[in-house]
Curated annotation (Swiss-Prot):
Biological process, per Gene Ontology: regulation of DNA-templated transcription
Keywords for this protein: Cytoplasm, DNA-binding, Transcription, Transcription regulation
SUPFAM superfamilies, alphabetized: YebC-like
Organism whose genome encodes this protein: Pediococcus pentosaceus (strain ATCC 25745 / CCUG 21536 / LMG 10740 / 183-1w)
Compartment(s) of residence: Cytoplasm
Protein name, UniProt field: Probable transcriptional regulatory protein PEPE_1240
Domain of life from the UniProt record: Bacteria
Intrachain S-S bonds: none
Pfam families registered for this protein in UniProt: TACO1_YebC_N, Transcrip_reg
Entry similarity comment: Belongs to the TACO1 family.
Amino acid sequence: MSGHSKWHNIQGRKNAQDAKRGKIFQRISREIYVAVKAGGPDPSSNPQLRLMMDKARAANMPKDNIKRAVDKGSGAGGANYEEITYEGYGPAGTAIIVSALTDNKNRTAAAVRSAFTHHGGSLGASGSVSYMFDRKGYIVISREDLDKNEDDMMEDAIDAGADDVQTSEEVFEIYTDPKEFAAVRDALEAKGYTLANAELTMIPENETMVPEDKVKQYTGLIDELEDNDDVSEVYEAATLPEDAE
């Protein structure tokens, strides 16, 4: 697992994402819709829906928006979405995984390929970069929200089944096996911890530093991918120079 903080990357792009909040809500609504279609409207018996609702709350998505997405998914008919994963290399050989939810594979594939090509990258075959990432549960607790002793919190996380706890000045980052993620999340919430973030994600085993002369090209690629309405998540094995973040 890379030693570079995933939370650092999340916070580093927060302002840009805030400006795209409407699109983020639209994507999460689509993910909630698909989760309800697949497993029903009750999050207690639909783990994927619970995960998407947690994601919605973490993004400060209004409750009315969440309810509308659940109600829409509970109705008959509607679009059929398919989850597709693309893998490729950005400028300077940075590994990138793109997760998309689409009702038109040809449209999405063309747009993703164009983004990579336009910004000096290349779209690869399935498996070309995914081996560089590990599927992990990822939970964040802010120091500001911590009411307990730090050692007690770390012990609670490990006892709940976490694989690793990393600390920084601002947060505790808790990593779990994907199969243990829900159990660890629920155990920590049951003990009264406030979770700043909780998700299943892809963690790079190593990260490539993007050279300064490639930063604009690289961030342009990530921005174009994230601006695509069909794209749900972009996972990066890259670190930007501090003055570029």
